[in-house]
Amino acid sequence: MTSASTKVGEIFSAAGAAFTKLGELTMQLHPVADSSPAGAKWTETEIEMLRAAVKRFGDDLNHISCVIKERTVAQIKATVKRKVYEDSGIPLPAESPKKGPKKVASGVLSPPPAAPPPSSSSVPEAGGPPIKKQKADVTLSALNDSDANSDVVDIEGLGETPPAKKLNFDQA
């Protein structure tokens, strides 16, 4: 199995060969010396084929760039979320959804599942398992909220023992 760096090297070698060929084709289209009959060999169809190939190449590179940017943004958001949870002393949820809400057959987004109401007591009910007190979740949407105090996130009520903590992301 080849390493990632070897694969990237092979990709750039192939790209170099492709750009060399593109340079040769461009020189045939626009010869330096007027005496060269190579420019006359190109038909409109061939020129259009070359134009389409170069456009597809650019479009494919743009698509790859978008995929990488989206993945990078998702990784950054996940890292920030994990850091916020760690800094606030809240355990990270065991199951974090990989995708947004699922689409139903009608094409309408299904509402997120309703969370059970928080219990104000950690005393177990008769015959049932002990019920833990629910903690408020700090979500990325709350962190990214552009309403009042967007630079400060108040995480009151996350723990009963320590006083309320404030996160300020503008500090260096």
Curated annotation (Swiss-Prot):
Chief site of localization: nucleus
Residue ranges annotated as compositionally biased, kind Pro residues, are: 110-119
Q: What are the entry keywords?
A: Chromatin regulator, DNA-binding, Nucleus, Phosphoprotein
- Choose one Gene Ontology CC annotation of this protein and give it: cytosol
Q: Which domain of life is it from?
A: Eukaryota
The signal peptide here is none
Q: Where does this polypeptide localize?
A: Nucleus
Region annotation (Disordered) maps to 87-172
* Feature: compositional bias, Low complexity: 120-130
A biological process (GO) annotation for this entry?
chromatin organization
Q: Any idea what job this protein has? A: Component of chromatin complexes such as the MLL1/MLL and NURF complexes.
Q: How does it assemble?
A: Component of some MLL1/MLL complex, at least composed of the core components KMT2A/MLL1, ASH2L, HCFC1/HCF1, WDR5 and RBBP5, as well as the facultative components BACC1, CHD8, E2F6, HSP70, INO80C, KANSL1, LAS1L, MAX, MCRS1, MGA, KAT8/MOF, PELP1, PHF20, PRP31, RING2, RUVB1/TIP49A, RUVB2/TIP49B, SENP3, TAF1, TAF4, TAF6, TAF7, TAF9 and TEX10. Component of the nucleosome-remodeling factor (NURF) complex.
Q: What is this protein called?
A: BPTF-associated chromatin complex component 1
Q: Name the source organism.
A: Homo sapiens (Human)
Which gene produces this protein? BACC1
